[in-house]
A protein has these predicted regions:
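Beta-propeller blade signature
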Residues: 1, 22-37, 80-104, 166-188
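Acidic, serine/threonine- and glycine-rich low-complexity intrinsically disordered segments
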Residues: 1-61
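Loop/turn-rich, solvent-exposed surfaces of beta-rich toroidal or solenoidal domains
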Residues: 12-14, 44-147, 158
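Eukaryotic short linear interaction motifs
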Residues: 19-21, 75-77, 161-162
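TerminUS-proximal long segments
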Residues: 133-189
Length: 189
């Protein structure tokens, strides 16, 4: 994570589970060299369990972006409406959590989804040829191509049902055997 003051640190994104409820924490936590800051002023709705994540820094806008690929989430959009499922299902959602230059968080969802209920416990590996700032942060300022393979999603859990755990049907989950290439494609303006 690169913070607006150019400090490198970590960010714990929203995640499961709360001590007194079988539900995810909705807020991220900033980890700095000398302290940590729970960001209870913001709710991250679209990704709640360890999933594949790619990180980007845009020096032009001074924004940090994290893209989450699938996984498990209490919330998803159903017919354009943010909807809660307390069973915290597997989702196909690809979402972006951004920190603006003034330190505020924003969350958005991509129109493209994962091809299946996958991504939970998966890992994103940067392509070694992609420019980075270190710490696995892709340097958007150094990318000039209209499209570029930026890395791979490896492993994780695949499910054929959104809520297999709520009905004790874990037989429909398995280790993900597909390796996904991830491409960054410049949007037309």
């Amino acid at each position: 994570m690169k913070y607006p003051n150019n400090e490198f640190g970590y960010l714990i994104s929203a995640g499961v589970f709360q001590i007194n409820a079988d539900l995810p924490f909705l807020y991220p936590v900033e980890i700095h060299a000398n302290n940590y800051v729970p960001r209870t002023d913001f709710n991250q709705y679209l990704s709640h369990y360890h999933s594949a994540k790619a990180s980007f820094f845009d020096s032009a806008s001074q924004q940090m972006h994290h893209v989450f690929f699938g996984g498990i989430s209490q919330y998803s959009y159903v017919n354009g409406v943010l909807t809660s499922d307390p069973n915290v299902p597997f989702v196909k959602t690809i979402s972006r959590l951004s920190m603006t230059q003034n330190g505020q968080f924003e969350e958005s969802m991509f129109s493209t989804e994962m091809p299946a209920l996958t991504g939970s416990s998966a890992r994103f590996f940067n392509d070694f040829s992609v420019p980075s700032l270190g710490n696995e942060i892709i340097d958007l300022a150094q990318i000039t191509a209209d499209s570029l393979r930026i890395g791979y999603i490896v492993g994780g859990i695949k499910s054929t049902e959104a809520n297999p755990f709520s009905v004790n049907n874990t037989g429909v989950t398995s280790a993900q055997s597909t390796i996904f290439e991830v491409w960054l494609v410049r949007a037309s303006t």
